[in-house]
A protein has these predicted regions:
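Extracellular/periplasmic Venus flytrap/periplasmic-binding protein
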Residues: 98, 142, 149-260, 299-307, ...
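Signal peptide-proximal N-terminal region
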Residues: 38, 62-84, 174, 202-207
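Extracytoplasmic "Venus flytrap"
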Residues: 44-63, 87-94, 116-119, 184-190, ...
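Periplasmic-binding protein-like
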Residues: 103-115, 136-138, 178-183, 235-247, ...
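Beta-alpha junction/loop-to-helix N-cap segments that form part of ligand/metal-binding clefts
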Residues: 55-62, 75-145, 153, 214-223
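Solvent-exposed, acidic/polar segments of extracytosolic/periplasmic ligand-binding ectodomains
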Residues: 41, 360-441
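C-terminal segment of classical bacterial N-terminal signal peptides
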Residues: 16-19, 24-35
């Protein structure tokens, strides 16, 4: 071809021929590139790699790369290799929406795995609905939501917050009578604490025995706040702290607990957003006995978990890298998505959304998780105590798996709502009015 172009170029009036030849070359190249692009299935990874949430989210990007690599070693999916497209929304909530749009519209990803905070999830929801794409969300959250385009593989409040309070109220958990609800100032802690406050009052806890406090993202000056907790806990009744603090603010919070000598035997703290990753950089000796509620702990001994940890260490080339609950949620969600795609032999969003409810995938703790019609999954619940090495000893667990409930039974505007995308095709069906479109609290 190139010899022909050179020959034509020496002739008079050859500009048209050159243009045509160049156009043909561009068309051929474009066709090759398009065919090349179609040879892969693109998967979007939407996690903060910088900013206040990087401490928690970077690991989720890494585990997705591992899962994609593993699937490619098995031969890919539908005869194609999987290709990760990684972006950094930088703990900037509006930027999450921009990056989600970029992944779906520009990069043409088939699915997105991402977000940690509820404010980031809320930011991207309109984009996924408008562009009809799929988001797998791997972190515990406040509930009060069920969207057609989202699959929630983290815990709903009935799979984490409520069981944690029940444990702390029990004799084994210390029979707590006073409660500090301490959280970061955004939608997840505020809604979760609204549910917990209603639940505690149903259990007979009085207003004066509930203290609620919020601090900004990235908060670091915990001396005054921890002093308030200490004072509240010195009133003669057993006091417990329920922590919905998110991101790197957890590090100075736990350091200050140690500085002020608050031991788990005095005022136990149960955390919903602190796991092995967040404790990795801390001196955990002063924190021994404090608690976390999750659906997975690295210390749980099963063949599946041992294999997962070994694979993780090999992939990261670092035996000190920990595993945690949201990583397991991505493991479950990714395998569910793969099964759904194989079932419908397509990555078409509508087909995959229809196929996902009913899909089962193994978890890492010895059981199976199932995607429910409300786009939440079944999960076991564990309460773990912090050990001196930054791991957790399981001190309590449910007998089996707990189905995720999208709408709280303890809030007036929510208790009559159901989410069912299989039969009702609705995420907020009101059982009283028999209509879709109910509003939660």
């Amino acid at each position: 071809m190139f010899k022909s172009i050179q020959a034509v170029a020496k002739r008079p009036n050859s500009r048209w021929w050159l243009s045509a030849a160049a156009g043909l070359a561009f068309t051929v190249t474009g066709t090759i590139n398009a065919a090349k692009a179609e040879d892969t299935i693109k998967i979007g990874i939407l996690h903060s790699l910088s900013g206040t949430m990087a401490i928690s989210e970077t690991t989720l990007k890494d585990v997705m790369l591992m899962l994609i690599d593993e699937q490619n070693k098995k031969g890919g999916l539908l005869g194609k290799k999987l290709e990760a497209v990684v972006v950094d929304p930088a703990s900037n909530w509006p930027l999450f929406a921009e990056k989600a749009r970029e992944l779906i519209s520009k990069d043409k990803v088939a699915v997105v795995f991402g977000c940690w905070t509820s404010v980031s999830r809320k930011s991207v929801l309109p984009v996924f609905k408008e562009l009809n794409s799929i988001l797998f969300y791997p972190v515990q959250y406040e509930g009060e939501e069920s969207e057609r385009n989202v699959f929630y593989t983290g815990a709903a409040p009935n799979q984490q917050a409520i069981p944690a309070v029940d444990y702390l109220m029990s004799k084994d958990g210390g029979s707590a009578k006073r409660w500090v609800l301490e959280g970061t100032d955004y939608v997840y802690p505020r809604t979760t604490n609204k549910i917990l406050e209603a639940y505690l009052k149903q259990k007979g806890v009085k207003d004066e025995d509930i203290m609620i406090n919020y601090t900004p993202f990235g908060f670091s000056d915990w001396q005054t706040e921890v002093s308030k907790i200490k004072a509240f806990g010195s009133a003669g009744k057993k006091t417990a702290v329920v922590s919905t603090i998110n991101g790197d603010a957890n590090v100075p919070f736990y350091k200050e607990l140690g500085n002020q000598g608050i031991k788990a035997t005095d005022i136990p703290v149960v955390a919903f957003s602190v796991g092995e990753e967040e404790l990795a950089g801390l001196d955990t000796k002063p924190l021994v006995g404090h608690l976390a509620a999750w659906n997975y702990f690295e210390s749980i001994k099963t063949p599946a978990n041992a294999a997962f940890i070994k694979q993780w260490h090999a992939f990261t080339k670092n035996d000190k890298r920990t595993t945690n609950d949201p990583m397991e949620a991505h493991y479950i969600g990714f395998n569910m998505w793969v099964k759904a795609v194989e079932k419908v032999k397509s990555t078409d969003a509508d087909k995959v959304i229809e196929a996902l409810p009913g899909i089962e995938a193994p978890n890492l703790t010895g059981g199976t998780s199932k995607m429910l019609p409300n786009h939440h999954i079944t999960k076991p619940v564990f309460i773990g105590e912090v050990r001196g090495d930054g791991q957790f000893d399981v001190v309590w667990k449910t007998k089996g798996v707990v189905p995720g409930d999208a709408w709280s039974d303890y809030l007036p505007g929510s208790k009559d709502l159901d989410a069912d995308w299989v039969t009702l095709k609705c995420g907020n069906y009101n059982r009283v009015t028999k209509k879709c479109g109910g509003q939660g609290s």
